[in-house]
Amino acid sequence: MVAFVRQTVFLGALVGMGLLSLPLQAEPKLQTETASAPDAFPIRFSYYPALAEKNTDGLDNAGVVILLHGDKGSRINWDKGASTAAGQPTFPAVLQEQGYAVVTVDLRKHGQSVLEGREDPIQNDDYAKMAAGDLKAVKDFLQKEHQEKKLNMGKMAIVGAGFSAPVATAFAEYDWLQKPHDDSPVPAMRTPRGQDVKAIILLSPDAAAGRLQTNKSLVFLNKQNLAFLFFVGKQDGADKGAAKNCFKACAGGTKKAEGRVELLEPDMKDRGTDLLGKAPPLIEIPMLKFLDTHLKKITVPWVDRRSRLDR
């Protein structure tokens, strides 16, 4: 009953703020996909395609949001939402209703992204493979959808939780380091191969995972003027200042970061994806407003991602 009330308040608030329209579809449209990372590791993910009826300006203007799970979690943390009342929409479903394409990922050695018949322990180098391999496979899939004008990969956001925070930021850093195709004498006219991630949300971010360091990537990404939203529960004893350090790494609190970098500290003890479903006005609604401002409403023209030399 409590969960139902929370979700009813959540939906009412979304409609009241113009972030959601009624009626909602009964079930979200989604499909399960498998992609191969560069090392052939199988990566399973759920794909919620952008809906034409929610994108009156065309699907080629639809942003895409990648959702990552936390430690010992899986994409089910997003797809099912343990604290969601029966019959009420999950966070990915709400994003889809808002017009986004959404991907929830099982990072390697989590959920269904495992080698058949094996239960391999996670090694230190796995985290870098998640960032540069698993998420590259997901992005390659999204590029195919982009080329068919089913979304605009130039309007991409990623959400990390716990250990997947450094994975998310490392992926975004790799993305921004991709140089455009050398297919025009005019640099501004060259076809992009990256620099697609425009916004990042981190829930209870870990400072590091293997050799990945969250703040190292954030310092670089902040120079690209990305938008950042950090969450940490005030009663989270495991945080040890990591979220505030992320905020500081992005020059949070300065005039340059005003309106672009934000840290929210709800009075909660939960961590990572466990923050979801407990107090939507403190977690989900700020996330949706952030994405609305820094992803949905930004102008990024759709661009053919093939090199001009191959068209």
Task: Locate predicted features.
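C-terminal catalytic histidine-bearing segment of alpha/beta-hydrolase fold enzymes
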Residues: K255-R311
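Short, surface-exposed "cap/lid" segments of acyl-processing enzymes
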Residues: A52-E97
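Alpha/beta-hydrolase fold nucleophile elbow
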Residues: K149-G162
